[in-house]
A protein has these predicted regions:
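Bacterial N-terminal signal peptides
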Residues: 6-16
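Eukaryotic scaffold repeat domains enriched in small/polar residues
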Residues: 19-381
Length: 381
């Protein structure tokens, strides 16, 4: 099915200088798509400039030509081959193929450059309850130009985790780096024959973040201080501390955190009912999660961590790191070079948040007052 929607074209940005790094203040997008999304859960730019967008609420993956406004669908909703339910992340593979995270069907699917489904494989690489350790769950965080998948294993506890590179062609897993994890809050309900265990980090957790470059380098964004290290095949580069004024957590920031968690938080549910183990994956708050959490009953930090969990490496090799800002303030991004230094900054218009960086520019999601999402592209070259 093909649909046509208008895209309007304009371009505007303001350039200023800040402490050794050029700052771009984006004002108007080069392209804003008129199509209304219920949500934008996954995004990627194709080699010909078209883009793919996964809307997990509407159960659709759209292929969009921003130059003409032409939109068609990739696959369709359902449980069968080439179908998906609650489509989520989209990642580039060689020959313009795409890896789709299919949360509702608990699997990942590969579509070739023409949009044809090629294969699917499960998110859980093992069976729940089959061994003493946690089930290996693969939620991709990035891919490189060779098609290797990078992920951070879920579960296991402790204050550190691993960045793992999965080379499917060689059937090999390699640990690329170790990262700091926040403590988890565990809640258990039910009886011995029907037990439900839920784990979640505290509000605004202090933890490392990371992103993958097309050439396979991994940017490690370190906490509690703020610096960027690079891990590559030829060695590691340790960056210098980057100044980060504290952002106090007040009532508005608490409300912001709860809203973002309800809309975008990833839930993994493993239930054991009389020996029958099942797993569910979902994005956002589920209907069976119970009453809304009481913000006053939660332990809040005095300030946000220096950076959020949003980061991306563009085709030019620069890392984009989303800085923490006050609630309802414009989002700000540090551009980090190969030595771990800040080489530029970008400030987005209010209500915009980065979803990807490609050869054509930087892509942002705009959510309006009614919760409708729009896709915008800005020229930041």
């Amino acid at each position: 099915m093909t649909r046509m929607f208008a895209a309007w074209l304009a371009a505007s940005l303001a350039v200023t200088a800040t402490a050794g790094a050029q700052e771009l203040r984006l004002t108007k997008p080069a392209v804003r798509l008129a199509h209304q999304f219920s949500g934008i859960n996954g995004f990627r730019e194709l080699s010909d400039g078209r883009v793919l967008v996964a809307d997990g609420i509407d159960d659709v993956v759209l292929r969009i030509d921003l130059a003409t406004g032409k939109i068609d669908t990739l696959g369709r909703a359902g449980p069968g081959p080439g179908e998906y339910k609650s489509p989520d992340g989209l990642f580039a593979l060689p020959n313009d193929a795409t890896l789709l995270v299919d949360l509702g069907n608990a699997r990942m699917s590969v579509f070739d450059g023409t949009g044809k489904h090629r294969e699917s494989f499960p998110i859980a690489q093992g069976q729940p309850g089959a061994g003493p350790g946690p089930v290996p769950l693969i939620f991709p965080r990035g891919t490189d130009s060779r098609g290797r998948i990078y992920f951070q294993p879920v579960g296991g506890g402790g204050d550190s985790g691993s960045v793992v590179r999965w080379d499917r062609a060689a059937a090999r897993f390699d640990t690329v780096a170790k990262v700091k994890l926040p403590p988890l809050i565990t809640r258990t309900s039910g009886g011995p024959n029907s037990r439900n265990v839920r784990q979640q980090p505290p509000p605004y957790p202090v933890q490392d973040n990371w992103a993958v470059a097309p050439d396979g380098r991994v940017a490690l964004i370190r906490a509690p201080g703020y610096r960027v290290d690079w891990a590559a095949a030829g060695g590691r580069t340790t960056g210098k501390l980057i100044p980060a004024p504290p952002v106090p957590v007040r009532a508005a920031e608490k409300k912001e955190f709860m809203a973002e968690s309800a809309a975008n938080g990833l839930s993994v549910s493993i239930e054991n009912n009389n020996g029958q183990v099942s797993m569910r994956f979902a994005r956002g708050r589920r209907d069976d999660d119970g009453d809304e959490p009481d913000t006053e009953g939660m332990e809040w930090p005095a300030a946000k961590p220096p950076f959020t969990g949003t980061s991306a490496v563009g085709p030019d090799g620069r890392l984009w790191v989303e800085r923490s800002v006050a609630a309802n303030a414009p989002r700000s991004y540090d551009l980090i070079g190969p030595a771990g230094d800040v080489v530029g900054r970008v400030v987005a218009p209010v209500g915009r948040r980065l979803i990807g960086v490609g050869a054509k520019g930087a892509y942002f999601r705009h959510v309006d007052a009614d919760g409708i999402s729009y896709l915008e592209r800005y020229d930041v070259r």
